[in-house]
C-alpha cells in the first residue's frame, strides 16, 4: 500500500473514532496522557499513541497493551512452517485466542529499506555506504482486553498521568521553557495570544487575565507549538495567510501540540475554548482530506517533544 493510501486509511479511521466520541479529540488531552505500548515494551508515539488511546477510550478498554495478530498466534503456541507455508501448533497446551467480535486498529511504522538496482544489487554512495529510503508500513493490533487465555498484567505500562497536581501559571510556564531548548522569548501583555516568526517571540495576556492556570498553560502551549515551526527548529510552513488551507493545518498542529504538552505535564482536563462553529469547520476539512489529520498529529508529536525536551 502506498504512503498516501496509508495516511488516508489511518486518518479516516481516526475520524470514525471521533464520530463515536462525539467530541473534538484535540481538546481531550487524556487521550494522550496515558501510555500505550506494544508487547515488546516500546511506548507508542505520535499517530500510534493517539489511535490506540482514542480507541481504548471509545471501547472502554482498561489495558494499555496492544498486540499484532502474529504475536497472538505466537502466544497461542503457533509457529510458521516455511516448508508448509502455514502456521502449525507447536504448543498444544496454549489456548490464547481473540474474543469474538473484537476488531483491530491500524498502527504505522517507518522501515528503512535498502535501495537496489534493476539487478537486485544494493546501491551505494561515493563512500560505499548503502543508500536507504524510508517506507511507511501499517499493521493491525488488538487491545489485550480482546484476548482470552493469557495473563498480561505484568506487561502493562506504569506511570499513567492522573492530572492531580495543579500548578500556577508561572510554574506551568517555567516547566515548559525549562525543557524547550533555544525557546522564543515570552512576552506578557495585551488581549491576544500569538507567535511572531519575525521576532521569534510569543505574546500572551498576563496570567491574571486567564480564568485559571490550565487555560493559561493551554494557550501558552498552543503558541509555543507554533514557534516550533520556525526555520531553525522543525521548519514547518508557518508564514501563511489567515484562513487558507496551510494556515488551517498549522492551527491544527498547534491545537494537538497544546493537548499533548498538557498531557505530558499531567493535566487530564483541557479548557473548552473552541467554538462549535470552529470545530464544525475543522471537521468538514478533515472529512475531505483525512491525511491532513495524520500529518498534523505526527508534526504535533515532534513539536510537543521539542517543547518538553523529549527527543
Show which residues each predicted segment covers.
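N-terminal accessory/interface modules of nucleic-acid-binding and processing proteins
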Residues: 1-311
